């Protein structure tokens, strides 16, 4: 492990330098890695493992769009693509990459194949952390761990193809064989992680649920809408309001922040922007911190998990979800966004 100073706090991380791909391949050489679920994370992780020389099979319900995608990606029925239970039977490491709702539904069929010495892998701590609500309690004679890439499966794959990678967290929940940590780290490297930092199942799920409801999606979309609405109410055109709210951020500022940091951005903008941003940053922090604390408490109490499980268990959930998404898609805000994106220069 390498010890890195993160803003004055020392953390141990695992990089490709001290845990090479060759080492990962050696650890996994006798394993059959069964990737269960070919939806959000499944394709990226499975294809990266395959390209890195790991023995991988995919388990997916036949006849679904995800099954068809797996076939299109080169997985062969009966050779590397199987129904879920058959893949679980063959796998020595079962990577449970189904959705949280899907994991609950598939658990009874999956757990009978979790025999002594096998490993159960997650990319999210939801099912195990909220086991009282999900019913997911792994047998005590298997390894249980997670590797959680900090981004989508599509990003994991595209960065891998460029020779890059996403950072990932990892956690060992149960070490029955004495090999759980090396199995977890080997898989973390083999799926294309840039570096791995240690967490726990609980911390992973608490930070993840807070992040996606907060800055990553919920808060971001909410503040987008708020600023757009204010500009429109004050007489600005849809195009101007969208450009000043979203387009400049995503196309100009965030790539620079990603490359250089927000501190660099503050030091390299106009003096007018610089002064205003410094003055208003604290006000936004003070306004949003109580909301984020309320959000974290809701996650910690299990309320957010309960909402998700209850919503996903309703027979008309997908229909209701499409109605909610349609409101977003048909709003002036995002209809304007669609037109703005079409006008981006392509050359």
Give residue ranges: language-model regions.
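Glycine/serine-rich phosphate-binding loop and adjoining beta1-alpha1 elements at the start
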Residues: 1-32, 61, 172-174, 192-199
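NAD(P)-dependent Rossmann-like dehydrogenase/reductase catalytic/cofactor-binding core
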Residues: 2-6, 11-17, 233-347
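Glycine-rich adenosine-cofactor-binding loop
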Residues: 31-49
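NAD(P)-binding Rossmann-fold cofactor-contacting core
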Residues: 44, 50-75
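Rossmann-like NAD(P)-binding element
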Residues: 61-62, 73-129, 137-152
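Rossmann-fold dinucleotide-binding core
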Residues: 121-213
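Active-site-proximal catalytic alpha-helix in oxidoreductases
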Residues: 178-233, 239-257
